[in-house]
């Protein structure tokens, strides 16, 4: 890392300090920044070119302390809050966006939901492995042909058969799907009730009847494995149900606002890196005998980008702070719902 990079990093650390991060949070950010720059960033070019995911990467992330940020320390986690988890996501995404995306699906969509809604037995069974990286997590909600009515139009079913449920259906665009060991899955247990007849299950992917139908080829976030999952008479024990029967919507909504807010951290991290690269290029690219950074038009454009990045960061941090300690059942409506949706919209558009 050259002195120019060091100066940029110091400036960004100062910006984060102004958001009143604790000393522990600053230490975590510094650690994640270092290991992401040294370990994850060198993988990015090959991951993008070959749509490649290193087989042992989740275990390596577990060893580096990048997983289970919100999980209890006695289960191998870090015992931090959701805001700190978002800081980790932001920094990882800055240095390797594909890893940032897969990290979010694992640590937030799967692990956080399990911590929030799982039984004591389910948490003890799966969370330690998710923290160590011995297990890779995913979430299965979206289905082929589903639009904004993903819950009401859900076709995947789970029918009771004695002490088991038998699952049939498919899920599409599932981040980590091709490599997942456990999937938090939503399926209809009572088709007559529409969205109110959905239940959540934690599915082990070595179950007979489960298969990855295809790994999808994407334009962006290449390397992060995304796939179609198929369940064909997939039998799971009733103990795999997360929450009560037909309460899947409450499981979905319990994490929706946090999930939206977490997306903003991915956008902010990527936008921050894009700004850094733009600044570096403007300083070394010369026209008419001087760096283009000295031209007022270029300076103006960079100033606009900087303003958008920092506005997105402020919006992101505000939304994330509002999600910390949100009581179960308080999400999915009202001010928090509006705030996280707006933050997600702004951060995504600012990054683009």
Predicted segments, located by residue:
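Alpha-helical interface subdomain recognition
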Residues: 1-95, 99, 105, 117-122, ...
């Amino acid at each position: 890392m050259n002195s120019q990079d060091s100066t940029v990093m110091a400036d960004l650390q100062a910006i984060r300090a102004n958001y009143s991060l604790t000393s522990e949070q600053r230490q975590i950010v510094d650690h994640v920044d270092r290991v992401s720059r040294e370990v994850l960033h060198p993988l990015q070019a090959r991951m993008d070119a070959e749509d490649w995911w290193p087989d042992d990467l989740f275990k390596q992330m577990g060893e580096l302390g990048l997983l289970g940020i919100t999980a209890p320390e006695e289960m191998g986690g870090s015992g931090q809050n959701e805001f700190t988890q978002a800081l980790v996501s932001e920094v990882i995404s800055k240095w390797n966006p594909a890893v940032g995306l897969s990290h979010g699906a694992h640590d937030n969509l799967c692990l956080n939901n399990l911590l929030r809604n799982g039984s004591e037995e389910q948490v003890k069974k799966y969370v330690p492995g998710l923290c160590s990286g011995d297990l890779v997590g995913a979430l299965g909600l979206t289905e082929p042909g589903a639009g904004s009515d993903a819950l009401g139009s859900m076709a995947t079913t789970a029918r009771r058969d004695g002490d088991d449920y038998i699952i049939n259906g498919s899920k599409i665009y599932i981040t980590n799907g091709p490599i997942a060991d456990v999937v938090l899955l939503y399926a209809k247990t009572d088709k007559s009730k529409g969205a109110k007849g959905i239940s959540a299950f934690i599915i082990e992917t070595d179950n007979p009847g489960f298969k990855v139908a295809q790994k999808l080829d994407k334009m962006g976030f290449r390397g992060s494995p995304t796939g179609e999952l198929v369940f064909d008479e997939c039998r799971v024990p009733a103990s795999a149900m997360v929450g009560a029967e037909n309460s899947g919507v409450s499981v979905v909504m319990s994490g929706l606002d946090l999930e939206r807010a977490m997306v903003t951290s991915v956008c902010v991290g990527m936008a921050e890196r894009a700004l850094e690269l733009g600044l570096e290029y403007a300083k070394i690219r010369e026209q008419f005998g001087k760096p283009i950074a000295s031209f007022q038009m270029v300076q103006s454009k960079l100033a606009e980008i900087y303003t958008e990045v920092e506005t997105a960061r402020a919006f992101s941090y505000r939304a994330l702070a509002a999600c910390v300690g949100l009581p179960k059942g308080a999400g999915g409506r009202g001010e928090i719902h509006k705030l996280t949706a707006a933050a997600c919209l702004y951060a995504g558009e600012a990054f683009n």
